[in-house]
């Protein structure tokens, strides 16, 4: 059975965050583990409060998982502060897991902010380069790329701009696009030719 670690916030209503990830993993026959970085008191209509976990405790949770379990993939969601991002990045660099998927969370579905606005530069400098796949939707891609997205060409330009920040692949999800939902994938293909002995 594959084992996937979710690093994200806890949603007490069960509709997002760690709880949603663990349900999804289970539904697909994957063993899910979790590192909680923030406890979010929220429901379907509002975010009541957010309590961030200390960077030290975040690091200890990551250590607890990696020292005992072989992790096949890591899925990262909400990282609310620069300190949280740095703690997670430090441990990912230490353990070097394969298959790191980052879906940066900036806002709750109801629009309430879940990421400190000052944390975007830390996300770009510290977290994005660790992503095997980065999966922002249009509003997140606009924030990261610092540009407005209103067309598929804009999505492509944002994907190229974000890709240059160091992730291995990016999928800009177009569910927030007016009209048809279009996703834009940007990645690098490395070809290693076979040497022939003469």
Predicted regions and their residues:
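Short, basic, glycine/proline-bearing loop/turn elements
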Residues: 7-10, 105-110, 141-147
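Single conserved hydrophobic/aromatic residue that forms the stacking wall/gate
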Residues: 188-198
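Glycine/serine-rich anion-binding loops at beta->alpha junctions
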Residues: 7-26, 195
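Conserved N-terminal subdomain of the carbohydrate kinase-like
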Residues: 2-6, 26-109
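Short glycine-enriched, charge-decorated loop/helix-capping segments at active-site entrances
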Residues: 46-53, 112-117, 145-150
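Conserved phosphate/ATP/ADP-binding segment of small-molecule kinases
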Residues: 117-187
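Short amphipathic alpha-helices and their capping/turn segments at secondary-structure boundaries
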Residues: 22-23, 85-95, 120-129
């Amino acid at each position: 059975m594959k084992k996937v670690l979710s690093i994200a916030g806890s949603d007490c209503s069960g509709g997002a965050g760690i709880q949603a990830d663990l349900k999804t993993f289970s539904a697909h026959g994957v063993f899910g583990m979790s590192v909680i970085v923030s406890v979010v008191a929220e429901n379907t209509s509002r975010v009541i409060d957010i309590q961030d976990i200390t960077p030290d405790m975040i690091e200890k949770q990551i250590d607890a998982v990696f020292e005992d379990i072989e992790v096949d993939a890591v899925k990262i969601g909400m990282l609310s502060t620069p300190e949280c991002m740095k703690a997670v990045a430090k441990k990912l660099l230490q353990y070097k897991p394969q298959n790191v998927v980052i879906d940066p969370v900036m806002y709750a579905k109801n629009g309430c902010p879940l990421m400190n606005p000052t944390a975007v530069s830390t996300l770009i400098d510290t977290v994005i380069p660790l992503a095997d796949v980065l999966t922002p939707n249009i509003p997140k891609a606009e924030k990261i790329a610092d540009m407005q997205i209103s067309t598929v060409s804009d999505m492509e330009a944002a994907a190229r701009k974000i890709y240059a920040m160091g992730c291995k692949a990016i999928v800009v999800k177009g569910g927030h696009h007016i009209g048809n939902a279009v996703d834009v994938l940007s990645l690098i293909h490395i070809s290693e030719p076979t040497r022939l002995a003469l």
